[in-house]
């Protein structure tokens, strides 16, 4: 988490291990997110922005703004499955007042629209920051669940090459996905393994892992 990934080797491994329709997501902050995105512009598609409940970067507060967001870069070779997680808004019925002629769209007739209040998601995701952590950059389980539901079907495999505290594995268990996780740091491997074990037990008993 504190050492940049070797990008050429990373992308070689991604193309070998991930099917062309698989989505590849990375959490990253400036300036590394720019380096990461530029390292594979052919696969870079767009980004989500995680809006945190707590700021970070207090040691640099007199030199730079506190960090309230973190970017999530999305890469893929071919379009992956995409299941937008709809947000609930206010239902409405709308009728255009009259027919007309637009220089951009030509002639149009009076039409009506109706919505049950469901809205397509924007790219800013507000999830509370984890307060009690195993890993310094631990992500919220709910945020990882959101991303897993967006890009995978139940029963599919989710992989995390920087597993840290095991949040991705817990989120995969909670959403009915399988997982493959990698972590090389002994300080995190043990606690993550125990956390995943507890999550398995929770899911097996009808609860959610934490």
Label the predicted regions.
Residues 1-191:
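Core catalytic lobe of class I
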């Amino acid at each position: 988490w504190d050492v940049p990934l070797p990008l050429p080797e990373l992308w070689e491994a991604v193309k070998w291990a991930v099917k062309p329709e698989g989505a590849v997501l990375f959490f990253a902050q400036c300036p590394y997110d720019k380096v990461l995105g530029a390292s594979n512009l052919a696969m870079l598609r767009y980004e989500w922005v995680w809006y945190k409940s707590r700021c970070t970067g207090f040691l640099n507060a007199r030199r730079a703004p506190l960090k309230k967001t973190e970017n999530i870069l999305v890469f893929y070779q071919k379009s992956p499955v995409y299941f937008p997680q709809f947000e609930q808004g206010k239902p409405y019925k709308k009728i255009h007042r009259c027919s007309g002629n637009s220089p951009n769209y030509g002639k149009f007739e009076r039409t009506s629209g109706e919505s049950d209040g469901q809205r397509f998601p924007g790219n800013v995701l507000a999830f509370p920051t984890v307060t009690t952590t195993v890993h310094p950059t631990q992500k919220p389980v709910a945020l990882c669940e959101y991303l897993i539901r967006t890009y995978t079907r139940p029963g599919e495999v989710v992989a995390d090459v920087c597993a840290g505290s095991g949040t991705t594995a817990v989120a995969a268990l909670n959403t009915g996905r399988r997982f493959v996780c990698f972590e090389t740091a002994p300080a995190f491997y043990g606690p993550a393994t125990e956390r995943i074990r507890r999550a398995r037990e929770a899911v097996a008993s009808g609860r959610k892992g934490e």
